[in-house]
Amino acid sequence: MGRELPILPASAQQAAEGQPENFVYSRVFCQKENSPPLRLLIEFLKSRGQLPITPPDMDQAGLDEWAWVQVGLGYHRDRKPIQLFCVRDRGSYKDVFEQEQKYFLELLSSFDDIEAHLATEYVTRSRFILTTQMQADVTEDGYDFNGWILEFYQENCNGLVQVDAQGFFSPKGELIVDLTVPQE
Protein backbone atom coordinates (compact mmCIF):
# COMPACT_ATOMS: atom_id res chain seq x y z
CA MET A 1 0.00 0.00 0.00
CA GLY A 2 1.31 3.43 -0.91
CA ARG A 3 2.12 6.17 1.56
CA GLU A 4 -0.74 8.41 0.41
CA LEU A 5 -4.10 7.25 1.72
CA PRO A 6 -6.97 8.63 -0.39
CA ILE A 7 -9.11 9.75 2.53
CA LEU A 8 -9.22 13.51 2.32
CA PRO A 9 -12.63 15.13 2.48
CA ALA A 10 -14.37 15.24 -0.87
CA SER A 11 -14.09 19.02 -1.25
CA ALA A 12 -10.34 19.04 -0.57
CA GLN A 13 -9.73 16.11 -2.88
CA GLN A 14 -11.75 17.62 -5.72
CA ALA A 15 -9.91 20.91 -5.49
CA ALA A 16 -6.52 19.19 -5.36
CA GLU A 17 -7.25 16.93 -8.31
CA GLY A 18 -9.44 19.26 -10.35
CA GLN A 19 -11.87 16.46 -11.17
CA PRO A 20 -15.33 15.40 -10.03
CA GLU A 21 -15.57 13.15 -6.99
CA ASN A 22 -16.14 9.47 -7.83
CA PHE A 23 -16.43 8.31 -4.23
CA VAL A 24 -18.68 8.78 -1.24
CA TYR A 25 -16.81 9.19 2.06
CA SER A 26 -18.06 8.75 5.59
CA ARG A 27 -16.21 8.77 8.88
CA VAL A 28 -16.54 7.91 12.52
CA PHE A 29 -14.49 10.07 14.88
CA CYS A 30 -13.76 7.58 17.67
CA GLN A 31 -12.73 8.39 21.24
CA LYS A 32 -11.74 4.84 22.20
CA GLU A 33 -7.96 4.37 22.23
CA ASN A 34 -7.81 1.44 19.81
CA SER A 35 -9.89 0.19 16.93
CA PRO A 36 -11.42 -3.25 17.52
CA PRO A 37 -9.99 -6.13 15.47
CA LEU A 38 -11.69 -6.67 12.11
CA ARG A 39 -13.03 -10.02 13.30
CA LEU A 40 -15.40 -8.20 15.69
CA LEU A 41 -16.67 -5.98 12.87
CA ILE A 42 -17.24 -9.00 10.63
CA GLU A 43 -19.10 -10.84 13.41
CA PHE A 44 -21.24 -7.74 13.99
CA LEU A 45 -22.06 -7.47 10.28
CA LYS A 46 -23.04 -11.15 10.15
CA SER A 47 -25.27 -10.69 13.21
CA ARG A 48 -27.09 -7.97 11.26
CA GLY A 49 -27.77 -10.28 8.32
CA GLN A 50 -24.88 -9.02 6.20
CA LEU A 51 -22.42 -11.30 4.39
CA PRO A 52 -19.11 -9.42 4.34
CA ILE A 53 -16.60 -10.54 1.73
CA THR A 54 -13.02 -10.27 2.98
CA PRO A 55 -9.99 -10.01 0.71
CA PRO A 56 -8.86 -13.47 -0.49
CA ASP A 57 -5.34 -12.93 0.88
CA MET A 58 -6.49 -11.99 4.40
CA ASP A 59 -5.37 -14.55 6.96
CA GLN A 60 -6.85 -15.30 10.39
CA ALA A 61 -4.11 -13.32 12.15
CA GLY A 62 -5.06 -10.26 10.09
CA LEU A 63 -8.62 -10.49 11.37
CA ASP A 64 -7.36 -10.29 14.96
CA GLU A 65 -5.01 -7.34 14.37
CA TRP A 66 -6.07 -4.13 16.12
CA ALA A 67 -3.51 -1.91 14.35
CA TRP A 68 -4.85 -2.41 10.81
CA VAL A 69 -4.79 0.56 8.42
CA GLN A 70 -6.77 -0.38 5.30
CA VAL A 71 -9.06 -3.18 4.14
CA GLY A 72 -11.71 -3.65 1.49
CA LEU A 73 -14.93 -5.36 2.58
CA GLY A 74 -17.34 -6.50 -0.08
CA TYR A 75 -21.11 -6.45 0.24
CA HIS A 76 -21.87 -8.12 -3.14
CA ARG A 77 -19.65 -10.16 -5.46
CA ASP A 78 -20.56 -8.04 -8.48
CA ARG A 79 -19.83 -4.68 -6.80
CA LYS A 80 -16.60 -2.98 -5.75
CA PRO A 81 -15.81 -3.44 -2.05
CA ILE A 82 -16.14 -0.62 0.44
CA GLN A 83 -12.68 0.55 1.48
CA LEU A 84 -12.10 1.07 5.20
CA PHE A 85 -9.22 3.19 6.47
CA CYS A 86 -8.21 3.58 10.10
CA VAL A 87 -5.83 6.40 10.96
CA ARG A 88 -4.74 7.04 14.52
CA ASP A 89 -3.38 9.84 16.67
CA ARG A 90 -0.07 7.97 16.76
CA GLY A 91 2.00 5.86 14.37
CA SER A 92 2.75 5.95 10.66
CA TYR A 93 -0.36 7.82 9.54
CA LYS A 94 -0.54 10.32 12.39
CA ASP A 95 -0.08 13.13 9.85
CA VAL A 96 -3.17 11.98 7.94
CA PHE A 97 -5.14 11.79 11.20
CA GLU A 98 -4.06 15.34 12.12
CA GLN A 99 -4.92 16.66 8.66
CA GLU A 100 -8.44 15.19 8.82
CA GLN A 101 -8.94 16.42 12.39
CA LYS A 102 -7.78 19.94 11.52
CA TYR A 103 -10.00 20.10 8.43
CA PHE A 104 -13.14 19.19 10.37
CA LEU A 105 -12.33 21.43 13.32
CA GLU A 106 -12.01 24.35 10.89
CA LEU A 107 -15.35 23.43 9.28
CA LEU A 108 -17.07 23.22 12.65
CA SER A 109 -15.59 26.51 13.89
CA SER A 110 -18.09 28.45 11.74
CA PHE A 111 -21.03 27.02 13.74
CA ASP A 112 -21.99 28.26 17.19
CA ASP A 113 -24.82 25.95 18.25
CA ILE A 114 -24.69 23.26 20.92
CA GLU A 115 -24.72 20.42 18.38
CA ALA A 116 -21.67 21.82 16.59
CA HIS A 117 -19.95 22.20 19.95
CA LEU A 118 -20.66 18.52 20.65
CA ALA A 119 -19.26 17.53 17.23
CA THR A 120 -16.19 19.70 17.88
CA GLU A 121 -15.60 17.88 21.17
CA TYR A 122 -15.82 14.49 19.44
CA VAL A 123 -13.39 15.53 16.70
CA THR A 124 -10.99 17.06 19.24
CA ARG A 125 -11.05 14.02 21.53
CA SER A 126 -10.90 11.40 18.80
CA ARG A 127 -8.09 8.86 19.03
CA PHE A 128 -8.69 7.35 15.62
CA ILE A 129 -10.81 8.03 12.56
CA LEU A 130 -12.52 5.21 10.71
CA THR A 131 -13.18 6.30 7.11
CA THR A 132 -15.23 4.42 4.54
CA GLN A 133 -14.87 5.03 0.81
CA MET A 134 -17.60 3.80 -1.53
CA GLN A 135 -17.95 4.06 -5.29
CA ALA A 136 -20.40 6.85 -6.16
CA ASP A 137 -22.62 4.27 -7.91
CA VAL A 138 -23.03 2.17 -4.75
CA THR A 139 -26.32 0.27 -4.49
CA GLU A 140 -28.89 0.50 -1.69
CA ASP A 141 -27.42 -2.72 -0.27
CA GLY A 142 -24.02 -1.00 -0.20
CA TYR A 143 -25.44 1.99 1.67
CA ASP A 144 -27.00 -0.38 4.21
CA PHE A 145 -23.72 -2.30 4.57
CA ASN A 146 -21.82 0.97 5.08
CA GLY A 147 -24.41 2.09 7.63
CA TRP A 148 -23.83 -1.04 9.71
CA ILE A 149 -20.06 -0.43 9.60
CA LEU A 150 -20.56 3.15 10.82
CA GLU A 151 -22.96 1.99 13.55
CA PHE A 152 -20.46 -0.61 14.78
CA TYR A 153 -17.75 2.02 15.28
CA GLN A 154 -20.14 4.60 16.67
CA GLU A 155 -21.45 2.19 19.31
CA ASN A 156 -18.25 0.31 20.16
CA CYS A 157 -15.72 3.13 20.00
CA ASN A 158 -17.65 6.11 21.40
CA GLY A 159 -17.80 7.67 17.96
CA LEU A 160 -19.63 10.35 16.03
CA VAL A 161 -20.57 9.77 12.37
CA GLN A 162 -19.82 12.29 9.61
CA VAL A 163 -20.86 11.86 5.97
CA ASP A 164 -19.43 14.10 3.24
CA ALA A 165 -21.92 16.47 1.61
CA GLN A 166 -24.32 15.83 4.52
CA GLY A 167 -22.83 16.48 7.95
CA PHE A 168 -22.54 15.01 11.44
CA PHE A 169 -25.15 12.60 12.80
CA SER A 170 -26.33 11.80 16.32
CA PRO A 171 -26.32 8.19 17.57
CA LYS A 172 -30.03 8.14 16.69
CA GLY A 173 -29.20 8.92 13.05
CA GLU A 174 -30.42 12.52 13.15
CA LEU A 175 -28.46 15.20 11.30
CA ILE A 176 -27.07 17.48 14.03
CA VAL A 177 -24.59 19.58 12.02
CA ASP A 178 -25.63 20.24 8.43
CA LEU A 179 -22.61 20.51 6.12
CA THR A 180 -24.53 20.50 2.84
CA VAL A 181 -23.58 23.16 0.34
CA PRO A 182 -26.53 25.51 -0.26
CA GLN A 183 -27.84 25.52 -3.84
CA GLU A 184 -27.87 28.90 -5.54
Residue ranges and their predicted role:
Residues 1-184:
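Acidic (Asp/Glu-rich) sequence patches and key acidic residues
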